[in-house]
Structures are given as C-alpha cells and as structure tokens.
C-alpha cells in the first residue's frame, strides 16, 4: 500500500520536498496545506511557491488562516494520513492535531538539531561562520523544533558559499532525506534520538536592520554577514541619509591606525574602508532607485570622497 501523505509547506525551500514525495511511486499526496495567498501590489494576490506547485501537479490544496481550526482538524481526521510532512510551513501545529497524529508528523529542518531551532537556520549558519551545516528530520511536538531526531545529513562549508547556494543544497538534501525516512520509517523511528537541550540554540527571523554594516566589527564578521544576508536584506551603509546597498566585498586582514569606518582609498578596484582588524573592499554597490554597478562603472559618473567616516 502507498504511504498516504498530507504535505504542509509554503516557500521555495519546501517545493523540492513536495515534488520528490509526489514523484515517489510509494507515496500518495492526499492534500497540501499552505499559507494564505499574499497581497503583492495593486490588490493582486500571489500564491505561495508550494501552492503553485501543488496546483500544477493537480493536488488538492487548502490555505487556512489557522491550521489548528476545527474544519482543518476534521478534514485531517477524515483523510487519516500515514504521515503529515511539515517543511517551512509558517504556523505551529497545536496539541489536538499532534495528539491525533502522534509520531506521524515529520518536519524537515535546515540545521543540525538542536542547533538553530527556529525561523532562520540557514542564515545563522553563515552569519556565525560555521564549518558545517545540514538538515534534520524530526518528529513534531509542542515545543519549537524540539522533537526527537530521526535522521541527519551534513555538508561541509567553505568560506565562499553564499546564502542562495546553501539554501539550494539543503533544499535538495532535505528532499532526499525525508523520502528515505518515509520509505523505511520503522528503522528510522526505532533509532530516533532525543535532542540535547544543553546544546540547543534558537534563532529568530531576519530583519532588514541586520544588514547595516558596522565597521567597528572585525572583517570576518562583516564578511559572514554578507554571505548570510545576501540577497535579503543585503548589506548596506548610510551616506548623507542615503542607503547604499553593497553587492560584493572583499576583506583584507591588516593592522592599521585608521578610524573604523574611514574611507581610506577609492579607485577602480573598490572603496577601501577600515574596520576593526583590517579593511573591507566594496567592489559593487547600488544607489537608491538605481541598478547595481561595479565601482569602476560607478566612478565614471560619480565620486566617493576619501577620508569620510561611514
């Protein structure tokens, strides 16, 4: 018999898992639950990436305001799935559903749990300069990402990997792993492990203000922010009340007696700004309401004063 699955998810990260579960001949996707359509502009509403894919695949999809509503519970109770798979859905599932489907609700989480429970694990693995990242499949319980872990897959990180690349790697790894777990569920369930609360950390949502460069920080910290916050919110600095977005940087570790934030040199190779333990070289930037430019292009029609403090 096929595994009957209800899939809950919303953003791009969840689409690969949905697709792979759908493609697996051992599975039957009974229903997809996603977040409500979001208003974009001029009263136009856009579906989530998961809803869009579900519709393309011809799968029934609902977008309840609250997944814990009575009518959703009744529908789930009637469908009686073997598994409810949760991938970046965006709402917490409460006790009634958890009790009804005990040990049947599986979550794909983009970190090596118990590290980085919460909303932004991929960002924080780069912000903190981690040397490895990964995905975990866990049982969903009432706590935030606190359930027993059924499986983990890890990846080594170099200093060059950026947010979008890591996102896509973990997206594929998560899709692979959830398929393996469901295909051989009893084996993974029997070897499940409790999370060590002493090693747990929780990360919140990413906010736009986090992208502002603080030149009092060390070069590695600034570079890791560039890796972990690009493309959104992206790095930026303020100049005469203008927000200047930064699209590429290099770093130089070198003792200097310049003030942090001082623009030391400006030429076609970049804007050289002093920081706590060296220099940040800004090689591509974007003025408000303009397209991104390499510094050599920028200097063709603009100037940037040396000696100012950013």
Swiss-Prot record:
Key word Transferase present: yes
Enzyme class per UniProt: transferase
Signal peptide: none
The family this protein is said to belong to: Belongs to the Fmt family.
PANTHER family in alphabetical order: METHIONYL-TRNA FORMYLTRANSFERASE, METHIONYL-TRNA FORMYLTRANSFERASE, MITOCHONDRIAL
Function: Attaches a formyl group to the free amino group of methionyl-tRNA(fMet). The formyl group appears to play a dual role in the initiator identity of N-formylmethionyl-tRNA by promoting its recognition by IF2 and preventing the misappropriation of this tRNA by the elongation apparatus.
The protein's name in its UniProt record: Methionyl-tRNA formyltransferase
């Amino acid at each position: 018999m096929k595994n009957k699955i209800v899939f809950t998810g919303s953003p791009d990260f969840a689409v690969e898992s949905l697709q792979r579960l759908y493609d697996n001949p051992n599975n039957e996707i009974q229903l997809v639950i996603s977040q409500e359509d979001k208003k974009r502009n001029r009263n136009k509403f856009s579906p989530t990436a998961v809803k869009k894919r579900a519709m393309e695949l011809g799968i029934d999809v609902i977008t309840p305001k609250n997944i814990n509503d009575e009518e959703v519970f009744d529908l789930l109770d009637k469908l009686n799935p073997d598994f409810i798979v949760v991938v970046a859905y965006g709402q917490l599932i409460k006790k009634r559903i958890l009790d009804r489907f005990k040990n049947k609700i599986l979550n794909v989480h983009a970190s090596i749990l118990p590290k980085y429970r919460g909303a932004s694990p991929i960002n924080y693995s780069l912000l903190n300069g981690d040397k490895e990242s990964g995905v975990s499949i866990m049982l969903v319980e009432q706590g935030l990402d606190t359930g027993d872990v059924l499986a983990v897959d890890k990846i080594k990180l170099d200093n060059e990997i950026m947010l979008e690349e890591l996102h896509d790697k973990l997206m594929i790894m998560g899709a692979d792993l959830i398929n393996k777990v469901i295909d051989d569920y009893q084996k993974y369930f029997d070897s499940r492990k409790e999370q060590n609360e002493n090693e747990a950390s929780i990360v919140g949502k990413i906010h736009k203000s986090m992208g502002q460069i603080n030149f009092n920080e060390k070069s590695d910290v600034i570079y890791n922010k560039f890796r972990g916050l690009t493309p959104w919110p992206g790095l930026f600095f303020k100049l005469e009340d203008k927000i200047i977005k930064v699209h590429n940087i290099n770093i130089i570790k070198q003792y200097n007696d310049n003030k942090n934030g001082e623009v030391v040199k400006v030429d076609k190779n970049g804007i050289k700004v002093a920081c706590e333990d060296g220099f940040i070289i800004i090689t591509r930037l974007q003025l408000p309401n303009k397209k991104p430019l390499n510094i050599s292009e920028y200097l063709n029609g603009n100037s940037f004063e040396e000696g100012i403090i950013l």
